[in-house]
Structure formats: structure tokens, C-alpha cells
């Protein structure tokens, strides 16, 4: 229980730095079409309501909103559209902005739920997401495929911006996160494999994590990470192979996709 309390305290310490912000001069600018609506700004999304965003965090919150608040309107933007350059974020009735670090607190207000999912979310954020970034951008063959088949599907100039200097930026980010000067690719992939094994064991034969009757945020987050892994155009796809060994996780992914009504991931038709 002490560990869960620490996770909860950690989330509160982060949230306290990023309160809900009301701007006297709203940013982005007011739009008459959405003046009374809540708008979620996504990145790497083609604006098709049945299509998945091609960014893990955008897909995660896009899916959560589709399942829990269908009234939310989605718009595609670049990271620079956000005051803190982190997407997604939401704008409420053209005035109040809820920035990315505050989304979890905004949508999940139940303390017990946060405590329950925190240790498992950390596996996805720290182990799996790190391995995704490494696989996409720091494997030369994979990055070549990403440049040809993934980034071009993004709007100009975002596709150009994303492809220039991105590997070195990602490497610095991961080194800083892991507090390492060099990266051990095999160790990072092994950590992701262990994370999937732990999540698979947690799910067991249940339909949703914690035997809930409907998808929790952990289910949605697992879905988002798994979808990106499954649809990335990679030559070296060890991460996809590892994920595929856990049938209960892939089945959960299919269930969430069906509930959310997705038929494509960017230009990729889903079957």
C-alpha cells in the first residue's frame, strides 16, 4: 500500500505544477463553431473520425474521449499549437485550456482508480514507450522506413520537421530519462518484454484489467501503445513479435478498437 501511496503522491506533485488555466486572451483563438464545446487537439491525425491518430499519446486520449465523452470535438494540430508544446490538450468552450500533464487529473478524478493504475501505467510509459521510441528512431533501417511510410502521411511541414535531427533528439531524451550516457538496446527491449509479461499476467483471462465491466484508462493506454507497435512500418519488429506472444493483450486491443469504432490508422486500413 505504501508503494501505491507514493505513486499517488507523485501524480499529485506533477498535477500541482500544471493547474487548469483560464486565459483572458484564449489560445488557440476562439472559434464560433466550437464556442460551447470541448475541443481536444490531437497531433498526427488525418481528421477522419474513424481513423486513429499516429501518436501514442494522442491516440490514447482520442480513444478515451471517444469511449467516455462522445461530445468532445477533435482537431488536428502540431505540437507548437499548445502553450507547453505538448499535445494532446483540450479547450473548454473556447476559453479554459487543460494542458497535457493535467488531462489525467481532469478525466480521472477518482483517487482509488489513480492508485490502482499508477504502477501499471509506469510500465507502459517508462518501459514500453521508451522501447517504441528506440525502435522507431534509433534503429537505422527502421527510421528509414518511418521516413518513407509514416512521416510523409503527416501534413507539411510537420513531416519535414519530424525527420530532421529527430534520432539525436530522441536519443538525448531517452538517455536523460534513464540517466545513462549510452543506450543498451537489448536491455531496453528486454525491459519492454518484461512489462508486457507483467501486464499479460495482470489481465489473465479477464476481458478488461482488474476485471472491470468496461475499459479503464489502463486498457485504453495499453491499446494505444499496442496499436502503434502493430502498425508501424518496421523492418526490425522485435517489439511487435514480443507483443504478439501475449494473445490476451492483442485480444484486448481488438476489443478497444471495435468499441471505439476505428477503421483505419492514418492511411492504414484496419482488419
UniProtKB/Swiss-Prot annotation:
GO cellular component entries: cytoplasm; SAM complex
Taxonomy, superkingdom: Eukaryota
Keywords: Membrane, Mitochondrion, Mitochondrion outer membrane, Protein transport, Transport
Pfam families to which the protein is assigned, alphabetical: GST_C_6, GST_N_4
GO terms (BP aspect): mitochondrion organization; protein insertion into mitochondrial outer membrane
Mitochondrion in keyword set: yes
Function: Involved in transport of proteins into the mitochondrion.
Family named by the database record: Belongs to the metaxin family.
Subunit structure as annotated in this protein's UniProt entry: Associates with the MINOS/MitOS complex.
Name recorded for this polypeptide: Metaxin-1
Upper lineage: Eukaryota, Fungi, Dikarya, Ascomycota, Taphrinomycotina
Recorded name of the encoding gene: mtx1
